[in-house]
């Protein structure tokens, strides 16, 4: 793991800083209640005794450049504005949301490939493996919070007003995900 850098936030996940504003909103009370319940249930996993270090925090397709060279695929990671010091497996949880969800559900072949590649470099502990569905769920709820904040509170966009609910459905599905291992 890379040594912690002074000044980086601790236990930050993309979308969590906006959650208090979302929780206070009365635009979608059912969503706000579900978000509050999920954060109360899942956030303790993020700050539990999992191995910690520097994480990217926003591993989605638009933050990756993939190119082939010499018969091998190479990945360049961009956009480190969400970087923080947190549970290392939290990055994997966010990557499951950003890279392995298709049509609102985890694509298990992609999940398996991501886990295999990750563990080829850094094996997960049993505790991390057990926490991963909760970390993925928390990541999806954090993204849902950001979408609500963005498309209802700061830049209202009626055509995107439903996206927070779609991500909430993803969160529930990721929490229920059973990992093979």
Model regions and ranges:
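A cross-family kinase active-site recognition segment
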Residues: 1-30, 50-52, 161
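Mechanochemical coupling/switch segment within NTP-driven translocation systems
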Residues: 32-42
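ATP/Mg2+ or Mg2+-diphosphate-binding catalytic cores
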Residues: 21-22, 30, 143-181
């Amino acid at each position: 793991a890379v040594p912690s850098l002074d000044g980086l936030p601790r236990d930050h996940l993309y979308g969590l800083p906006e959650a208090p504003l979302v929780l206070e909103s009365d635009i979608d009370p059912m969503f706000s209640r579900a978000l509050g319940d999920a954060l109360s249930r899942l956030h303790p996993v993020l700050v539990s005794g999992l191995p910690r270090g520097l994480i990217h925090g926003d591993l989605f397709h638009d933050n990756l450049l993939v190119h082939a060279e010499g018969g091998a695929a190479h990945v360049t990671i961009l956009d480190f504005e969400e970087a923080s010091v947190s549970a290392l497996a939290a990055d994997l949880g966010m990557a499951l949301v950003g890279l392995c969800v298709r049509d609102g559900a985890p694509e298990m072949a992609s999940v398996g490939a991501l886990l295999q590649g990750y563990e080829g470099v850094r094996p997960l502990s049993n505790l991390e493996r057990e926490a991963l569905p909760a970390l993925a769920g928390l990541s999806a709820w954090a993204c849902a919070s950001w979408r609500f904040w963005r498309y209802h509170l700061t830049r209202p966009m009626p055509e995107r007003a439903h996206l927070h609910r779609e991500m909430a459905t993803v969160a529930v599905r990721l929490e229920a995900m059973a990992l093979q291992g």
